[in-house]
Amino acid sequence: MWSIPKFGNEKNTFVDLSSSYSFKTPISNEERRRMGCQNPTFPFQEKISTREILIEPIQFGKFSISSEKLKNKYEGMLQLSCILSQDDVMEFAEELFENKSCTVLFNLKVLGLHAFFKMDEENLKRKLKNLDQNETDLAFIFIILLYALIEEDIKSSNDIYSLILQHSRNNKLISYIIRLIQAYENKEIGYDFFGINPSYLECFAMAIHIFISHNDNPQKVVDQALRFDKSVLRFLTWMLGASYGSNWIPQEWLKFSPNITNLIEKFLK
């Protein structure tokens, strides 16, 4: 897809989602501790924010890619969210697409849906103004990144790093990204910052690391993401859909996904 640096853990085992969401080769407790994963008994602990943002009204913008390609990317984003994160986003998506306005939680289950409506940066910032500064910064950067992936403006890993460093006002996130860049240059693993109870910022940085490390193979991205906090997986489901669309998704996975064709076609009319 594009040239990428190769760093991080290269040992990957594809996860068979046709039977379960567990690992074919379970990660050992020692490996989980080494990689900084959460408590092995509860690997996917939820972090919930009750802060709300009001999206009203949503203003449509136009992406430059073809409507056929746009439809495929939207399908990929929704399907992967339902299949991998096991999130029920359909009710919210239907309300969002039908009414073009709603109040939503700052929640990774649905945050990526806002990338379906392309807005200029100032308008997007206004939509996020009710969040605290950390949430505003992260939501803004994530949606801007999804815009760039949908538009296929990302040509290299440096494009992702540059986008984040350009837009972020959060010093912690900047430091995480710089450490990932330095890790690549020094041929190190690069995710030593990822703690036992990672923050959203740490999960986002980890998602960026995994996405760049295995961007030539989305199934490897999925396998690696399943080893970490579920927030990492949620970031990556939206990113993979925005980048690859739905054509790569194995047929055996699709039985876990609701039929979203009519919803997407209705939205794109």
UniProtKB/Swiss-Prot annotation:
Alphabetically ordered keywords of this record: Coiled coil
Family matches, as InterPro entries: Ribosyl_crysJ1_sf (IPR036705)
Coiled-coil residues: 114-141
Organism domain of life: Viruses
Keyword Coiled coil applies: yes
Protein name according to UniProt: Uncharacterized protein 228L
